[in-house]
UniProtKB/Swiss-Prot annotation:
This is Large ribosomal subunit protein uL4. SUPFAM superfamilies: Ribosomal protein L4. GO terms for biological process: translation. Residues 64-76 have a biased composition (Basic residues). PANTHER family: 50S RIBOSOMAL PROTEIN L4, LARGE RIBOSOMAL SUBUNIT PROTEIN UL4M. It holds the Pfam family Ribosomal_L4. Keywords: Ribonucleoprotein, Ribosomal protein, RNA-binding, rRNA-binding. GO terms for molecular function: rRNA binding; structural constituent of ribosome. NCBIfam families: rplD_bact. The gene is rplD. Residues 60-84 are annotated as: Disordered.
Amino acid sequence: MKCDVKTLDGKDAGSIELSDSVFGLPVRTDLLHRMVRWQLARRQAGTHKTKGISEISGTTAKPFKQKGTGHARQGSKRSPQFRGGATIFGPVVRSHAHDLNKKVRKLGLKTALSAKAQAGQLIVLDQAISESGKTKDLLAQLKVLGLEKVLFIDGPEVNEKFALAARNIIGLDVLPQQGANVYDILRRDTLVLTKEAVKHLEERLQ
């Protein structure tokens, strides 16, 4: 698959051949769904907690005798039917993470890249370097390219001045190639890869 290469100023910088085994796969929404669920489950803090009956402060004495009162029998003031009582089978602190095979994760990333390529939402840049490191200069370049909600993926090292210029722009994310992931690719309208990123991603995902 051939793709045009642009510069940050919107000029043509030749073309690049993208591997069909990474950028030309059929789009499988089931895989993308599984990957997003897996990523978000790993991020979830899981700090929810309610007190069980053994954790509630209060007396352990029986509220009143078993028989002769005319009331339903009760064994503890800490039971859930009483005000201030325990929660039964409530949430506990736990990890929400679940397993997903490495092959599925690899295929999911390739599918996300392919989905962007097939939707015409993939741009390849010659390089992502900012000379000034100023946000206003980068905003002007993004306007020329017609980009708003965008994810930039560079090679192993992101240009320091580019990252500095980009960090205060809402809707713009910058990642090194090793940080490429399905969730961040899908949540932005456009995916921008540098030639260096394409090279490393193809090597890693072949």
